[in-house]
Amino acid sequence: MSPLALVSVSDKKNIIPFCTELVEKFNYKILSSGGTAKHLMEAKIPVIKVADFTNSPEILGGRVKTLHPKIHGGILAKRTDEEHKKDIEAYDLELIELVVVNLYPFKKTVEKGSKWEDAIENIDIGGPSMIRSAAKNHKDVSVLVDPSQYQEFIEESKKGELKETYKAKLALEAFQHTADYDTAISNWIRKERGLQSSKYIESYPLIKTLRYGENPHQKAFWYGLNNIGWNSAEQLQGKELSYNNLLDLESALSTVLEFGYEEKDELTTETFASVILKHNNPCGASIGNSASQAFLNALKCDSVSAFGGIVAFNSNVDSETAINLKDIFLECVVAPSFDPEALEILKIKKNLRILKFSKDQIPNKNQTSTKSIMGGLLVQDTDNIEEKTESWITVTKKFPSTQDYLDLSFAWKICKHIKSNAIVIAKDQQTLGIGAGQMNRVGASKIALQAAKENGYGGVLASDGFFPFADTVELANEYGINSIIQPGGSIRDEESIEMCNLKGISMVFTNKRHFLH
């Protein structure tokens, strides 16, 4: 007796050659409905229509096609169970050996910004039911949910009876497929209706098993979305990305995105930006009138820490920039585009990872960030609030000069991406000194100011949190700081304001804090 395969797919990739092999090499009968049945019949593949098989028509505009005892009985029946055998005979059930189903393209539908009603109609009901039934009864039934599985199924079938371990793997992938589908639907409803969910559910496919985590003794895996973010970035050269590379690339790119992001020379001359990053903290950043100048200025801040670092650009990398990059040991360079001549120069360094991250691969701003804690997960909105400089308040008698204001804005954007407590000293829109990850603000200030002293004198100071005391202002004055930007909000703000007035320093409150842990 010929085995029966139920085939109902939205993604019709490779379905014709696959079903042809099922019929011609393994003597399968094909059971199908709707668009899939039509597609197969047009290719001259014999098909039994579901409506004929169940003796029940599609109803409710196609909403009900396969939700029928003849379908699910044929899938769920346990072949060796005596009670099931009686039902099989009593209800004349024909056993289904293979279920090939993938689902309505719900994710693609909502990504296009479809209407609520259109999205609802793209919620598959029959498909997940068949997949789950087959996966539950995987001892007797095989289930395929993705075209990438077809060839492996053919090869396994050539060996004879399918192994239980292979069928169990198919069942696992099937349940993960429906879980991912339901996650997409529930998250869409939550976002569309602005609802607070009682459960946090996300679904990310495995991209790659990494060599190790932060340290060689730690296992690590990379999960992500297929069409956006780092998985869609194009690696033009270099060894595979490590766990630490990915963390640093994320921080570097997030920082440089503060200044716009264009593949070609569409930026204004004031917004070519470069960031050098090490151990998840910027160690140098600058805006210049070219990518090359921005990089060289960023390098001046801390050329020692730049060794083995990550460099990010917000504009095209040309040959001049590549020449400046090639003499420094770097782990990765990321930019929206690279000139062919620049790539030739950079590829001389065989181990350098070169990544092209296009503008359209940047996720939208409505993202969340997560951190694992013992027994749980912390979830928050990403810190990507748009800063409105018109809401900033100068709280001192002295106002920042035009140049100081530009530097304050620049330093504030960089400070947001540095581990707290964070202090940034900047002048002419380049960092002179950075104090990161210190347990007190004065300690971070000392590190940043001392580094700045080696790179120049004066400039502005940015702090990611408020000043609990006036001591940071006093210290800043000793190093010639002209202006300060900070959130404000301390019960001792007046002390810091008075000290600024006494020392002739201007100070701006943003009313926004940017802690980063």
UniProtKB/Swiss-Prot annotation:
Every MGS-like domain range: 1-145
Entry keyword annotation includes Transferase: yes
SMART domains named among the record's database cross-references: AICARFT_IMPCHas (SM00798), MGS (SM00851)
SUPFAM superfamilies: Cytidine deaminase-like, Methylglyoxal synthase-like
Family annotation (CDD domains): IMPCH
One cellular component term from this protein's GO annotations in UniProt: cytosol
Reaction(s) catalysed (UniProt annotation): (6R)-10-formyltetrahydrofolate + 5-amino-1-(5-phospho-beta-D-ribosyl)imidazole-4-carboxamide = 5-formamido-1-(5-phospho-D-ribosyl)imidazole-4-carboxamide + (6S)-5,6,7,8-tetrahydrofolate; IMP + H2O = 5-formamido-1-(5-phospho-D-ribosyl)imidazole-4-carboxamide
Transmembrane found in the keyword field: no
Pathway note: Purine metabolism; IMP biosynthesis via de novo pathway; 5-formamido-1-(5-phospho-D-ribosyl)imidazole-4-carboxamide from 5-amino-1-(5-phospho-D-ribosyl)imidazole-4-carboxamide (10-formyl THF route): step 1/1; Purine metabolism; IMP biosynthesis via de novo pathway; IMP from 5-formamido-1-(5-phospho-D-ribosyl)imidazole-4-carboxamide: step 1/1
Entry coiled-coil feature ranges: none
Domain topic, free-text comment: The IMP cyclohydrolase activity resides in the N-terminal region.
HAMAP family xrefs: PurH (MF_00139)
Family, per entry: Belongs to the PurH family.
Protein name: Bifunctional purine biosynthesis protein PurH
Organism name: Prochlorococcus marinus subsp. pastoris (strain CCMP1986 / NIES-2087 / MED4)
